[in-house]
Amino acid sequence: MSSLVKIHARPKLHEPNMLAAWPGIANVAMIAGSYLAHKLNPKPLAEVVAPYFFDPIGVLVRDNVVESPQFPESRFFYWKNTPGKKDLIIFIGDDQPSSKTYEMAHTVIDVAERFGVKRLYTCAAALTRIHHSEQPKVWGAATREPLLDDLKARGLVMGGDLQISGLNGLLLGVAKERQLDAICLLGEVPQYASRFPNPIAALSIAETMLNILDIEVDLAELKEQATEAAGRLKEMAAEAMGDYIDYFTEPIWERGESEEEEEDDSPGSPN
């Protein structure tokens, strides 16, 4: 195993799948991945040696005492399914490194191979013209054509040509280089809401992911988050529309007399 990874446990896993997630657009991947990790309560498996990939840019001071440099965590967990079903490894990266992303992806695949992972999954956002009041669909992308057949059968959208940015996408390409099957589930996010966390899209992804992995998880809390987010998006959209109307229109009682006279004297005005 690479010196870039610290192994904490060596469990015997049954044909495990792996789910990997980093922060990304609308934080969709992290919301979905972190929620499943929280609910499944998996056990620590390994962690990436952070100082190799991240450079601290400062320190915290508490009660006038300087603390040691803090690094984003990149951790692996394992969860054992019921006998006969496939186990699961979950990787959660608190942040994406500004460089060495290709090496980070290979490091994650190293762990996947070490524990016999059969298939890798990532999540991402699919920016579309969907309205915030619509139920987001889930798109699918895979490293091999045969993998797409199952996704199509489950009703996933085949988006054709697209780009998956960051490590949630790059990991798929590295998996293909290493001949490991990999799939990405992308939840639809309105283009105008890409900067806001979107548990609505994360919920759609989580429902699809659990179905594919044959795992049961209570999604009630995530559904509550999605409902709250839908309300906030509705409010933001209403405010934005109000600002738009205010900017491009002007109440007639705020016009000066000179403006009204100019309109009366304009060509084509009735006399």
What are these regions (language model features)?
Residues 118-119, 180-184, 215-219:
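Short, structured loop/turn "capping" segments at alpha-beta junctions
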Residues 1-93:
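N-terminal short beta-loop-beta anion/metal-coordinating cradle
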Residues 24-31, 99, 103, 107, ...:
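Conserved active-site and cofactor/substrate-binding residues in soluble primary-metabolism enzymes
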Residues 129-212, 248:
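Catalytic cores of processing enzymes, dominated by hydrolases/peptidases
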